[in-house]
Amino acid sequence: MISPGKKPLVQDIDSLKRESLIGKVKLFHNEITNPQTLFTNSYLSLAQQLYQSIIKPFEANLQEERIDTILFCLGTGLRTLPIAALHDGKQFLVEKYSLAIIPAFNLIDSNYTPIQKARVLAMGASEFTTQNPLPAVPIELSTIVDRNLRENISAKNISRGWPGKLFLNQDFTLKNLKNQLSSQSFNIIHLATHAEFKPGKPEQSYIQLWDTQLHLDEIKEIRWNDPPAELLVLSACKTAVGDRDVELGFAGLALQAGVQSALASLWYVNDLGTLALMSEFYEQLKTATTKAETIRQTQIKMIQGDVYLTREKLKFSRGEIPLPKSLQILGETDFSHPFYWSGFTLISSPW
């Protein structure tokens, strides 16, 4: 544990071997994402065991120093750990701290810029020739961006989306992505689509655009940093998953290419759950002090059942969004299970 102005604190956990810890992380990951246990708390035992192993040894120090944000630098085999879902027996870790994963301490951009003045480039696809459709994507993008808004987020327009540009399906091309990034300044880049990561095969790992696949080894060719993007949101499956050669996957490579922070996923995410999380995330981003606090408040809202579906509508902090028939459900459902909210993690700068 390294805290401001203090010497590093090292705790050796002799009772826990590396292989055992990695094994528990895998079991925990599998339990949260198991569709057969989605409406149970079967994950809770492992969530508490991992909390005791990873957080408990430092708990007194965290409280004594009044720490409010924890940055995790995770080793091989631990990077798929949904840290937000660790549990102390009473509450989840994210209910106590803002959280982020960092690739290395010397790679953090410590400059703080208020995100409330951001312009958003939102692009995505809902229709595919060889993959399942994502009917929630058009609603996700239109909820995030208000193309008629020409001014920064403020008290008078806080009930609207963000200023920026929106491109869907046929307009979500590699050429257009590059053109938009080179011709205008966007603080936030949001991509909503399918993605696939295959360990050891960068040429077969991709983010699906309308006209092509943006492969893992092509990520660094995009000019994300001219001017630098403060946040890249990868609203797609397994975009934070990597291997020994490519730590933190697509998000990790985007950080190397100049993006300050990335919000990415650890597993195959649910279309409606992603719509709910992203809608709330951008709403919280309007008033939160940091990006890490934004995702924290978003996840807390989901844990508490304040973000939910009721037949024809999605309800969240801004109000409600009508859903097309293809997304409507019978009855009511919330997103309090960690499958829906703990899979998205902030990587690199928490600010």
Regions found by a protein language model. Name each.
Residues 67, 275-351:
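An often Trp-containing, charged/polar helix-loop segment at the C-terminal end
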Residues 103-106, 110-111, 187-280:
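Catalytic cores of nucleophile-dependent amide-cleaving enzymes
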Residues 78-88:
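A short acidic (Asp/Glu
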